[in-house]
Amino acid sequence: MHGQAPRSQASVTDATNLKDSRARMWRYPAHTRGRRHKDPDQEEVFVPIRGTLTVLVEDPPQRIDVEPGDVIVVHQGTPMQARNETDEEIVFFAYGAPPVSGNAEFLDDVEKA
């Protein structure tokens, strides 16, 4: 998003030759966020490895802080946004099935939930 440090990702899908799902490792610098969206086809699982991942789900958004060792599942068609609202970089694993891309509907961003 404009004005924030870039996020980075590594494709686990490519490295492991996944066929029926997609997986990525993400790094979010301090105070960055992904785009708010809903995916009609894909269920997603998020697992923080380092730091607290904030996920806004539903509409109106509900804030869920996910710590390392916790897991959050976002079902198909559910509005969501992944965020790092901390002063430290976070690292998390994201897994989705089926392995579709390009169908997400992007939504207006919200400041706080």
Locate the predicted segments by residue.
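A generic "binding-loop/recognition-motif" signal
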Residues: 32, 41-42, 60, 78-79, ...
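A short, N-terminal "cap"/entry segment at the start of jelly-roll beta-barrel domains
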Residues: 1-25, 35-36, 104-113
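Residue-level recognition of conserved beta-strand positions in structured domain cores
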Residues: 25, 38, 49, 57-59, ...
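Double-stranded beta-helix
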Residues: 3-6, 81-113
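A short beta-strand-loop-beta hairpin characteristic of the jelly-roll/cupin
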Residues: 42-68
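Short beta-strand His + acidic residue motifs that chelate non-heme Fe in jelly-roll/DSBH
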Residues: 35-36, 55-56, 64, 74, ...
